[in-house]
Amino acid sequence: MGSDDQSAGDRIQKGFQINYMILRDADSGKIIWQENKDFSAPDHEHEARVPVKILDMRAVSREINFSTIESMENFRLDQKVLFKGRIMEEWFFEMGFVGANTTNTWQSTIEAAPESQMMPAKVLNGNVTIQTSFYDNETLITKSVVRLYYI
């Protein structure tokens, strides 16, 4: 990554923030969890307390509302689910062009792993982190780490 890419990433990050996140049961649309917090801040590990029933759902709809001052040509994210630091799952999502000085909502559906691959909540609790890297094309904007606790 060249210095121009780095300065572009820094410029975008300064004007980028997550306003809220919502997780819904993808089948019923019912809200499972909502947090009005900027999870994009890269300087510390965030925490989320999510109802344990999320582990029983076939699919979860994730809604991210974010604001940006800078435009982005190809906004995308790479999301890794880690258990005790080891990658369990990895997903790639692409939103595309995002205009300058806008607030946007991005909704995507995440399907559950097969039941045979699921671990109980007591094993997962506090041991799972979600590492999300936000990009404009190949330029890293920010990286967020959220530790999950099941309640």
From Swiss-Prot:
The GO cellular component terms are: cytoplasm; nucleus
Q: Give the SUPFAM superfamilies listed for this entry.
A: E set domains
Q: Which UniProt keywords apply?
A: cGMP, Cytoplasm, Nucleus
Work out whether the entry's keyword set contains Transferase.
Answer: no
Q: Which Pfam family, just one, is annotated for this protein?
A: GMP_PDE_delta
Q: Give compartment(s).
A: Nucleus; Cytoplasm
Is the keyword Magnesium in the record? no
Q: What is its main location?
A: nucleus
The similarity comment for this entry is: Belongs to the PDE6D/unc-119 family.
- In Swiss-Prot or TrEMBL terms, this protein is called Probable cGMP 3',5'-cyclic phosphodiesterase subunit delta
* Source species: Drosophila sechellia (Fruit fly)
| Gene that this sequence comes from | PrBP
